[in-house]
């Protein structure tokens, strides 16, 4: 039987293959609020996401969905980064997003808290993120306890 969140309460659950339809509904809802996303939700996208849950290259991925009243209202995705550089495992925050209509209700904090708990259990002590440059995102990132903003991000295309 599928686990469903309680009505009116925010529940954070692991993003699994069977929750893809919920995540896609969330992504469509995001676009209804503000269509600034750089990818289309088409058959190829759905197929790629589905295959990713069965592909061993994605075994270091950690993703959670925040539910309210049976619908996804937020999502967080991260990946573990083990390195021989210093023998550590860090994590990279790939995406955290909450529906605009549900922001400022501690949804992002709950997602981040859930992820942080799992990272700590896995021996990860640092979560690295490239941050969105808009004011709302910057306020959120600056509000995170025990964090500091530094460095400059660069995106390098591998061709």
State the predicted function of each range.
Residues 65, 71-80, 92, 97:
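Conserved beta-strand in the GNAT
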């Amino acid at each position: 039987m599928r686990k469903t969140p309680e009505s009116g309460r925010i529940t954070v659950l692991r993003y699994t293959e069977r929750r893809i339809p919920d995540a896609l509904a969330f992504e469509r809802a995001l676009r209804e609020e503000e269509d600034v996303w750089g990818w289309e939700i088409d058959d190829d996208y759905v197929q790629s996401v589905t295959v990713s849950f069965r592909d061993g290259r994605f075994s270091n991925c950690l993703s959670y969905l925040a539910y309210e009243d049976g619908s996804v209202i937020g999502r967080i995705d991260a990946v573990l980064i083990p390195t021989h550089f210093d023998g550590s495992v860090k994590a990279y925050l790939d995406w955290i997003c909450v529906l605009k209509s549900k922001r400022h209700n501690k949804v992002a904090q709950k997602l981040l808290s859930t992820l942080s708990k799992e990272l700590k259990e896995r021996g990860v002590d640092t979560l690295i993120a490239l941050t969105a440059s808009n004011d709302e995102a910057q306020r959120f990132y600056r509000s995170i306890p025990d964090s500091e903003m530094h460095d400059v991000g660069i995106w390098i295309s591998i061709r």
